[in-house]
Amino acid sequence: MQIEVEKLTDFSLMKKVVKHVFNLDTRASLAKWYNSEHSPIRTQLFAIFAYDVPYSVCMQMRTHDKNGALFLIESGRPDAYGSDRVKSQSGNYREQPRNIFIMCNAQHLIDWSHKRLCGKAEKPTREFFSLLKRQIANVDADLAKMLVPKCVYRNGLCTEFKPCGER
């Protein structure tokens, strides 16, 4: 599994939006904005290219597309697009890893991390999101610090019916 992340916008856009919408010249750092989780952080957009992602992880991540993020998942059907990669795979197409593209904002990533870094998440999903967090750190270290399991976010309070006991 491999993940590449591109940050599509920068802090200057967020400052311009804050000035335009709220008539404020913000002096707060990007880290402070991420910590506040106020709506302007949604101006920080990311393109994520993930390769050979387990099918189960693709499907778990896809559950997050209802909040405005874009998810495009490589088809596993041998009759779709005539891909040599797909044609070379034999057996149940649901067992084959997929390439996935995600376009999302900073708030999406913060919200998803609460579930996907949780000890109750499937191990391959935690591995995927841990790798994603490391790649996010390469383009936005302030955001990467905010990507934590919900129990960390809530200072040790776990809201799962059966806590994992990690914290």
Predicted regions and their residues:
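Family-specific signature for flavin-dependent thymidylate synthase
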Residues: 1-167
